[in-house]
Amino acid sequence: FGMGGPLANFAALLHMTVHSLTKSAIFFAAGHAAQTAGTQRMEGIRGLLAVSPTVGWGLMLGALAILGLPPFGVFASEYLILTTAMREHPWATPVLIIALGVAFAAIFRRVQPMVFGETDARPLPHSPALLPVFTHIAMVLTLGLYMPPALADWYRLAARLIG
């Protein structure tokens, strides 16, 4: 909001939706990762793909989505925000791109060893219940590839009402 016009408002509404779905998926996956590793410290969580592949995949997909990689919905919303910024406030575009780059590097640096790092732990005999993680990620992926017309209409109406 504040970037200018209905397209920016539409992008902001879409971003709030996909970002919150992605973040909740990451929180669910991180909770399972902490239970799997027996610690809440990120430094103590390593090699999730080897120990619990479903937790590892859930965390990795959530991280890729929150980083704004295509085809996830966060990419679509950030793309709309950046294109609106380029049109309405060209000076803000480099700042946004740098901020996205810093966020990308920081998140990737922390998540990569959690998912792919070396571990002494043995694989778990069972997989935790990760339905919420993969449901949210599937919704974010869907919104990156296809927006249901009813949802697009609702966002357009809300964007116009916002200003």
Task: Please place each PLM-identified region on the residue numbering.
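Helix-coil boundary and interhelical linker segments in multi-pass alpha-helical membrane proteins
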Residues: 1-15, 84-91
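Transmembrane helix-loop junctions in multi-pass membrane proteins
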Residues: 3-10, 68-80, 145-152
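Histidine-centered catalytic micro-motifs
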Residues: 14-24
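Residue-level recognition of pore/gate-forming positions within transmembrane alpha-helices
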Residues: 19, 63, 100-101
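Interfacial and helix-entry/exit segments of alpha-helical transmembrane bundles
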Residues: 22-94, 121-140
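Cytoplasmic/organellar membrane-interface segments at the starts of transmembrane helices
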Residues: 52-55, 104-163
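Alpha-helical transmembrane segments of multi-pass integral membrane proteins
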Residues: 90-110
